Each structure stands twice: as C-alpha cells, then as structure tokens.
Amino acid sequence: LESANQDLDLQLGSLANAGGRILHTGNGTFGLDSGQVIRAGGELTTNGLLDIRASEWTNSSVLQAGRLNLDIGTFRQTAEGKLLAVQSFTGRGGDWSNDGLLASDGSLRLELSGGYRGNGRATSLGDFALNAASLDLGNAASLAGGANVTLGAGNLLVNRGRITAAGDLVASAASLNNYGTLGGGGNLRLNAPALLNERGLL
C-alpha cells in the first residue's frame, strides 16, 4: 500500500501487514490507531508524524517515520525490531527493554520512569538524551550520538557495552558501574557519588 497524500488516515476494523509494506511519502500525519500499528506486523514507513501510545508493546517489525513519538508503558523490542526516525525520535514510558535498533537521523530523546535495558542499539546523528530510573546495558549494547549525549539514571547505571558521543558525553547516576566503553569526542563528565570502572575504558 502506497500513498503520496500529505496526510494518510486509515480507519480500519483490523489490519494484518505481516510480510507486507505500507508507505506514506507525505509529510503530514499518518493516521492509524495505535493498537493496529503495533499488531500489524510487516514494514510501515511515513515521511510524516507517527504517534504510538500503548500500555505495553512488543515490537519485532520495522517502523520508520519522519517524526516518531512513542508513549509506551512497558516496551520490549526483539533483535529483529527497528524503530527509525528521520527528524526526531521522542519516547516516553515506564520499563523499556531493547534488543533491536532505535535510531534517528536527527535527535533522539527517551524519558522513562522505569528502567532501560538490553543488548540493542540506540543511536542518533544529532543530540541524544536518555533519562530513566536505571540503565542496564548488555555486552552487545550501544548508545551513540553524533553530537552531545546526556544520560541520567536515578539509581544505578551499569554499562557492559559502548556509550559514545561525537561531542560531549555527560552521564549522571547515583551509582555508575562501567565494564565497557564510555567515550566522548569532546568533554567527558561523569556525575556519580559511587563509581566503579572494572576493565572498562574511559
């Protein structure tokens, strides 16, 4: 299914897109019920705005939007899942687990009341900000920003993977345990009353 209209509004009883592709080349709003988006499967691409709100969601599909806004209580992304944004990626919610890819060609910002964990990648070409109650990055995980990166963990930040910034990197946590890589092309600032760097690289 392909549409070049400025806005695309789909009012459907249900949508099955497994193995299929929906392409919206307009720059307006992609109108589809959040419940149908997260159950549809397949690939969904829009050059416009895509808003997804749900209490919980497990994603193993590929979704791309010009501007992607997520408000997900409990979010889990498998290794096959990809959420991509061209201009901006904004995410809010509770507990998030990412084993896939979260990416933006512009800015990426996540504000979580719970934890962020997993072995997946989160990357932006612009500024990157992630604030959560806790951060737990696995051995294969990476957080990368093409400009400045700001991380905040209300409690514990555990890094076994790679956290990098082309610009400044600022990480703040009540306790920071680094077993991986923390690096910035500009300034590196770690704000943590308790800091452990065991076989890690700063």
What are these regions (language model features)?
Residues L1-S3, N17-H24, R39-T45, W57-Q64, ...:
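Short, T/G/N/S-enriched strand-turn elements that build extracellular solenoid repeat scaffolds
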Residues S3-Q11, T25-S34, T46-R53, G66-D71, ...:
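Surface-exposed loop/turn motifs in large extracellular/passenger domains
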